């Protein structure tokens, strides 16, 4: 094999024992999990915002962002439940570039997976312990989920991973909502097949064990736009897109039909300020059609402290080093606008 086996990493149980969740933290997560579940099952008509930096690059600035987010979340909690987006793994189209805190706890340092495992657990723990906010992360590596399984309230499977069988089967064994994105080519049947697979029970290999999952009734779709073969970005958040997805769900017979609309990525063409208009467009569609209102459970928004983005070695505190994000002032205003229009 063309790889060096550098060192054996601790298993999730060992990391959890060294960095434990307190009973108080567990109770907060359990309560938030119940609230979020009630939205996906239709028992609650509150709205979900999965919101935060494109990538969680530095703990200090991410936690400052979450502190600000918590203050706003408390003011809109009658209409919105806010889930901070703390994405610590980054899929890369060609494999190059910053791969996230798991790989590089120091964005300008060398990869260090052991330090990375500890760093991402401590970051998610801080969000829960210090701000009472259980968080969302992307499940880029299914085998790594258990390092964070007692901290996360939401998981996303990305556009490049949604066709992968291990992602689908692992999603079927989680007890929290898992959003499965449409693939980069835009074929919604691929996404719906992934959602269907995640809803069903399976027997498979996970972390060296033969396991049986019970199926995840909270697995759902995420619309993020797509690219044509010639590289053109195409959005899929419009009224007719949401209505089409409603029809696909009706044909599928799946329990708890749901979608989260990703306002960035190909939906915005990575023009981060377009996220504001897209959010309002989705809310307008929801007001126009009760089926869309029931289907659309929330939005995914990329935002940070400072507008835009910078290179990985940039020194602007709280500005994204991956995709451009909304800055804090625009974010705060948008959250209040969303609450006013629900």
Task: Give the residues covered by each predicted segment.
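Generic N-terminal targeting/processing segments that precede catalytic cores or assembly contacts
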Residues: 28-46, 61-74, 82
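Short acidic, Gly/Ser-rich segments with clustered Asp/Glu that frequently serve as metal-coordination loops
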Residues: 54-57, 256, 264-270
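Active-site-facing alpha/beta catalytic cores
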Residues: 66, 79-244, 265-270, 274-281, ...
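N- or domain-start disorder-to-order transition segments that initiate the globular core
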Residues: 1-43
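Conserved, mostly hydrophobic/aromatic
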Residues: 52, 261, 327
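Internal helix-turn-beta structural module
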Residues: 304-342
């Amino acid at each position: 094999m063309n790889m060096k086996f550098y060192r054996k990493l601790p298993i999730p149980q060992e990391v959890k024992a060294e960095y434990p969740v307190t009973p108080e933290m567990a109770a907060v997560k359990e309560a938030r999990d119940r609230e979020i579940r009630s939205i996906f099952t239709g028992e609650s008509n509150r709205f979900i915002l999965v919101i935060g930096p494109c990538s969680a690059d530095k703990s200090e600035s991410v936690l400052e962002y979450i502190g600000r987010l918590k203050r706003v979340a408390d003011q809109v909690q009658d209409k919105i439940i806010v889930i901070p987006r703390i994405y610590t793994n980054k899929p890369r189209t060609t494999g190059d570039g910053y791969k996230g805190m798991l790989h590089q706890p120091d964005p300008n340092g060398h990869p260090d997976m052991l330090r990375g495992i500890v760093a991402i657990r401590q970051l998610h723990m801080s969000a829960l312990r210090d701000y009472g906010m259980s968080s969302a992360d992307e499940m880029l590596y299914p085998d790594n989920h258990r390092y964070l399984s007692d901290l996360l309230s939401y998981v996303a499977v990305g556009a490049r991973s949604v066709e992968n069988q291990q992602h689908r089967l692992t999603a079927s064994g989680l007890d929290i909502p898992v959003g499965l994105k449409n693939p980069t080519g835009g074929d919604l049947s691929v996404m719906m097949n992934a959602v269907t697979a995640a809803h069903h029970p399976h027997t498979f290999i996970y972390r060296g064990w033969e396991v049986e999952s019970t199926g995840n009734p909270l697995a759902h779709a995420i619309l993020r736009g797509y690219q044509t073969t010639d590289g053109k970005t195409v959005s899929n958040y419009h009224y007719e897109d949401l209505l089409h997805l409603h029809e696909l769900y009706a044909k599928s017979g799946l329990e708890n039909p749901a979608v989260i609309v990703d306002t960035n990525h190909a939906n915005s063409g990575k023009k981060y300020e377009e996220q504001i208009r897209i959010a309002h467009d989705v809310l307008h569609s929801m007001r126009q059609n009760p089926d869309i209102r029931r289907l659309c459970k929330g939005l995914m928004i990329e935002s940070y402290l400072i507008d835009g983005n910078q290179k990985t070695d940039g020194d602007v505190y709280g500005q994204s080093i991956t995709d451009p994000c909304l800055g804090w002032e625009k974010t705060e205003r948008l959250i209040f606008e969303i609450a006013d229009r629900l």
